């Protein structure tokens, strides 16, 4: 566990993820989601003097933690960029095709969820923001204030998998005509009233809040770009380890890996000659999807939805 500004963060699948990377003492590794440094610190403990670790994060608080770690350990560097941009960063550093392993631990962190001022949670009232990097893009409040009802409904349905998306979006638009939304608790209450069928054990605003967060941070677009960039950065034999926390993320990861296991055979023209390499897999998948153990779930209930998938680059 690491402590950050009074908010606890327990790194999910810590040992399992780093073990899956198969860290070599002299290897070069990327932590695409530094967070509070749980995975990075364990990776560094396995690296020798010649090993290197490059961390990425959009969150200014995570970057501050990373800079403190970099000051302690010269083998580590952290940059304030999305992992979707890791291809550019790796190229600028002359590391394209030379990376030994990439780790992506997706989603929102506990410090982000638990800090009311970040605006991610409906449980703790705060400004309706939800941005991983509060200095870039539009906040959730700005999106809610300006988007057409159809767009809000799409975000709730497509990214939040909310079946009452239309009804909830209309309630949001009707209320904003009277008074704009500025606080998370205010929005959560309107969504709660508009949701006619509450799921047992789940706040009725859960799915809509997830949809807003994913949209505001372009999480799925970043994931698709980041997976492609990660693969290109890896050397042959390098590992890609991805931990996802909801079905939309995991579906993207699973389909990405399945496609590369097949090579390019699914996208070839019919009745035309093709190169043999088109049928050669680009990766191999290591094992089945892995989930948190009972012991980890007991210590950290937020790990219940975590799914880890591992691939190795073949060519």
From Swiss-Prot:
Entry keyword annotation includes RNA-binding: no
Keywords associated with the record: Cytoplasm, Methyltransferase, rRNA processing, S-adenosyl-L-methionine, Transferase
Reaction(s) catalysed by this chain's protein: cytidine(1402) in 16S rRNA + S-adenosyl-L-methionine = N(4)-methylcytidine(1402) in 16S rRNA + S-adenosyl-L-homocysteine + H(+)
Top class in the EC scheme: transferase
UniProt key word Cytoplasm: yes
EC number: 2.1.1.199
Protein name per Swiss-Prot or TrEMBL: Ribosomal RNA small subunit methyltransferase H
Gene source species: Pseudomonas fluorescens (strain ATCC BAA-477 / NRRL B-23932 / Pf-5)
Lineage start: Bacteria, Pseudomonadati, Pseudomonadota, Gammaproteobacteria, Pseudomonadales
């Amino acid at each position: 566990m690491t402590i950050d500004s009074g908010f606890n963060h327990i790194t999910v699948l810590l040992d399992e993820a780093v073990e899956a990377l198969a860290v070599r003492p002299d290897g070069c590794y990327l932590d695409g989601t530094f967070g509070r440094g749980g995975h990075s610190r364990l990776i560094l403990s396995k690296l020798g003097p010649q090993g290197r670790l490059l961390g990425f994060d959009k969150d200014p608080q995570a970057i501050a933690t990373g800079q403190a770690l970099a000051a302690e350990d010269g083998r580590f560097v952290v940059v304030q960029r999305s992992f979707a941009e890791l291809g550019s960063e790796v190229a600028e550093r002359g590391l394209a095709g030379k990376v030994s392993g990439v780790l992506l631990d997706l989603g929102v962190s506990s410090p982000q969820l638990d800090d009311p001022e970040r605006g991610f949670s409906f449980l703790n009232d705060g400004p309706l923001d939800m941005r991983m990097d509060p200095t870039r893009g539009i906040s959730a409040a700005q999106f809610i204030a300006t988007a057409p009802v159809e767009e809000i409904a799409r975000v709730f349905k497509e990214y939040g998998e909310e079946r009452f998306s239309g009804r909830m979006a209309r309630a949001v638009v009707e209320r904003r005509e009277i008074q704009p939304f500025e606080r998370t608790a205010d929005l959560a209450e309107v969504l709660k009233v508009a949701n006619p069928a509450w799921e047992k054990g789940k706040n009725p605003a859960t799915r809509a809040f997830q949809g807003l967060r994913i949209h505001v941070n372009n999480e799925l677009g970043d994931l698709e770009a980041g997976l492609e960039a990660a693969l290109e950065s890896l050397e042959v034999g390098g590992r890609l380890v991805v931990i996802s926390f909801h079905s939309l993320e995991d579906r993207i990861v699973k389909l990405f890996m399945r496609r590369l296991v097949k090579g390019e055979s699914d996208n070839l023209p019919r009745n035309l000659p093709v190169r043999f390499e088109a049928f050669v897999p680009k990766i191999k998948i290591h094992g089945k999807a892995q989930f948190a153990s009972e012991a980890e779930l007991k210590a950290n209930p937020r790990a219940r939805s975590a799914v880890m998938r591992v691939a190795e680059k073949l060519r």
